[in-house]
């Protein structure tokens, strides 16, 4: 599969405690199948971060890749927005 055909997702880093791995939560909105109300869905993905660049709270872009471990199927492409530390 070519790189431009792989799934690309945007999300927020919720954990960077593992070495070279980040946990990213991706939030989407969908319509309820029966009632039609907009519902917020969120899903967590583990992504490979080779240089430990992303920190907790950052907005990142991740891309689908080959399985890197039992749970990792994505890799970090870029940090879109750094978290503001107060």
UniProtKB/Swiss-Prot annotation:
CDD domains assigned: Ribosomal_uS17 (cd00364)
Gene Ontology annotations for the cellular component aspect, listed alphabetically: cytosolic small ribosomal subunit
Pfam families xref list: Ribosomal_S17
Source organism superkingdom: Bacteria
InterPro entries cross-referenced by the UniProt entry: NA-bd_OB-fold (IPR012340), Ribosomal_uS17 (IPR000266), Ribosomal_uS17_bact/chlr (IPR019984), Ribosomal_uS17_CS (IPR019979)
One GO process term, biological-process aspect: translation
Keyword rRNA-binding among UniProt keywords: yes
Keywords: Ribonucleoprotein, Ribosomal protein, RNA-binding, rRNA-binding
Gene Ontology terms, MF aspect: rRNA binding; structural constituent of ribosome
Keyword Magnesium attributed: no
PANTHER family named in the record: 40S RIBOSOMAL PROTEIN S11 FAMILY MEMBER, SMALL RIBOSOMAL SUBUNIT PROTEIN US17M
Subunit structure, as described in the record: Part of the 30S ribosomal subunit.
Protein task: One of the primary rRNA binding proteins, it binds specifically to the 5'-end of 16S ribosomal RNA.
Family: Belongs to the universal ribosomal protein uS17 family.
Name of this chain's protein: Small ribosomal subunit protein uS17
Organism: Streptococcus agalactiae serotype V (strain ATCC BAA-611 / 2603 V/R)
């Amino acid at each position: 599969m070519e790189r431009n055909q792989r799934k690309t997702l945007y999300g927020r880093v919720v954990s960077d405690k593992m070495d070279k791995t980040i946990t990213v939560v991706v939030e989407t909105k969908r319509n309820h199948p029966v009632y039609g109300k907009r519902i917020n869905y969120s899903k967590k993905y583990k992504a490979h971060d080779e240089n430990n660049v992303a920190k907790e709270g950052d907005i990142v872009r991740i891309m689908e890749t080959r399985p890197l471990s039992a749970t990792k199927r994505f890799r970090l492409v870029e940090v879109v927005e750094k978290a503001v530390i107060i």
